[in-house]
Swiss-Prot record:
Protein name per the record: Lysine--tRNA ligase
Assembly with partners or alone: Homodimer.
Chain positions recorded as Mg(2+) 1 binding sites: E415, E422
Cofactor-binding details, from the entry: Binds 3 Mg(2+) ions per subunit.
A single Gene Ontology CC term: cytosol
NCBIfam families registered for this protein in UniProt: lysS_bact (TIGR00499), PRK00484.1 (NF001756), PRK12445.1 (NF009101)
GO terms of molecular function: ATP binding; lysine-tRNA ligase activity; magnesium ion binding; tRNA binding
Residues the entry annotates as binding Mg(2+) 2: E422
Amino acid sequence: MSEQQAQGAEAAVDLNNELKTRREKLAALREHGVAFPNDFRRDHTSDQLHADFDGKENEELEALNIEVCVAGRMMTRRIMGKASFVTLQDVGGRIQLYVARDDLPEGVYNEQFKKWDLGDILGARGKLFKTKTGELSIHCTELRLLTKALRPLPDKFHGLQDQEARYRQRYLDLIANDESRKTFKVRSQILAGIRQFMVGRGFMEVETPMMQVIPGGASARPFVTHHNALDLDMYLRIAPELYLKRLVVGGFERVFEINRNFRNEGISVRHNPEFTMMELYMAYADYKDLIELTESLFRTLAQDVLGTTQVPYGEETFDFGKPFEKLTMREAIKKYRPETDLADLDDFEKAKGIAQAVGIKVEKSWGLGRVVTEIFEEVAEAHLIQPTFITEYPAEVSPLARRNDENPEITDRFEFFIGGREIGNGFSELNDAEDQAQRFQDQVAAKDAGDDEAMFYDEDYVTALEHGLPPTAGLGIGIDRMVMLFTNSHTIRDVILFPAMRPVK
């Protein structure tokens, strides 16, 4: 047996012994009455106490004579004879408890408190004061065990370092890591901020089907499920777009939805098969209006959530305070591959040669528009660090977008990039039912030619368009990637509470 194996075996024995001891303590609690009481009520959280009283001196606190009730998990404990200090952690942070034997009912300190374990959940009542070092604390007059923890905190609360374990046991990660808790609080604030922003501009939040007979609204491989009652194969949605635009046809002129999408594709630092999107549709608007809305949304969220428009990310700092850069797809290719002759992008064979020169394998089903788009993604996308809008996407890769009036080979579409990543996609919507039907047919042909991500033909959606879709613009923003940027997170798993994981065998 290697030294590492021996250490692992020893750790397993230690853990089993601790689990046994904790269960014995729980059994003793059961014998003496209610083991999991539910009658303790707190009146403050730790962050409220720090916000209200950190600025006061101990003499002021003594004069105020403030009694508070708090509850949370015992993270540290220093026993010093007849008195102890405890760090209690709750949703707002941490607060220190001062626990003295003579200030508690008889027997509580020695017979109960000393037998409790780190990780146990406690309720405490007492007066606020400050220690000699100036730390806000609670001088306890009541201390109760509310929940007995049967398992120890990770590594005696030196932190949960194993990355896989952090994702699989997110509850331990949230207990052990301040940064993880902060990340998901920021995520919640971002979602609340988006809703406030959208409602303030007259948008109505709606919900559309998660299971669909025809998966539409994006080019992606769907998950397939089966509806037993209907005896029908269905798909987890890859996007809500076509249903949201049906609502615009029905007269809801400004709608948005924040919800999950599912795409049966690879997992990477940027991709999770289950992810959150915000999509909006706005009647009597075009893609330029949504460029302005997107810029305003990100600037507003940065200021409201983070308190600044200068957002650090790795070695970069994103500047949401100044106007965002705007480039056409071809301008971006030229900027980041200066030797490109833009005229060559009008000829399939020449464009194919450029694609192959930069390492792209050109598929037989691709047309010129797809080739040009692939070139852009290869040579330019990673360089789009500061907030940048890319416009003039080819019609071939934009089956739901309105064609440009001056050049029908491109569409009135943009994608929004930050940090070399696509964060949003928006366009003036195609509301010509006949054009939409033809593009669906082109997608069917591409699927028949082997493109697994090509769209299905949605006859009901075409019928809806035949009833008349007002001039409309639509936008989709990846919430997970947005949160990554705002929290300086470098993998999407760090911003999804429970990311997709392969089961442990």
